[in-house]
Amino acid sequence: MFLDSRKGLFPMKLGLAPLTLFRPPPLDLVRYAGEAGYDAVGFQLGLQDMPVSPLAGDAQFLKEAKALLKRWNLSVMEVSNIVFEPERTFDEGRVLIDFAKQIGASIVQATVWDDEQDRVVERLIALADYAKGLDLGITIEYMPYSQCQGFNEAYDLVRASERSNVHVLLDTLHFSRSGGVLADLDRKEASSYSFIQLCDARAKAPAPEDLRYESVYDRLPLGEGALDLGAILEKVPTDLPVSLEIPCQRLKDLPLVEQAREHLRIAREFLAPYAHRWELEVDPVT
């Protein structure tokens, strides 16, 4: 069981996703995660319709980030996002994979905004092969408002790539809003899930044109919505890394570190009946 004098007694290690705090500067996010008592943190250095952040190749930023991670005894779960868009280049993905290796991340996320599947698969294979050489993989995040709208589309990319280091992200909001049902998690294909991002949400989905707003700005803390999170947690493998991605309007006026702390408090209370199943090993950056 996990025991830390600052973080308390809790067997499930939890990461803080950048979107939970509405994407603050990365070094600030590390500080907030550490002060709030998280075990891990994510770095978001790539977004749709934007160039990869120059921080991904900045040696001074890497040095400062590593120092903060060590100070707060934090691991890095994910680096995001490799963005599959028609005009993207291999090097834009490579620099994120390189950063992930240097910072000690276990996951490199990818999103798909290109409806030419053959082109996506070709680029995915090239980046997966490069990542494998660094002992990393690529995890595809499906979103109902992207060109990879649900698990079936993401799994098609996994299968087409024929690469063992290509996986799928289970985001509980996107799982629900894309039409996912619990029985889907019993399919053998569900073994391709390698990472879970938790949030809650209202029972009624917004209109299709509002799905992105809900995803980026209006999720709910665990237990405050209608998603069957408990049933999901009972079905998923216990070796999946777990991160909180919960941008929430109710908490947005609190100082960012207090938002982080409150999300963690609520999450631990909600997850307590399931947390004993997790024995996740995520080593801090040295």
Task: List the predicted regions and their residue ranges.
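Active-site acidic/histidine proton-transfer and metal-coordination neighborhood
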Residues: 3, 68-75, 84-168, 177, ...
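Active-site beta-loop-alpha junctions enriched in small/polar residues
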Residues: 17-21, 44-48, 81-84, 111-115, ...
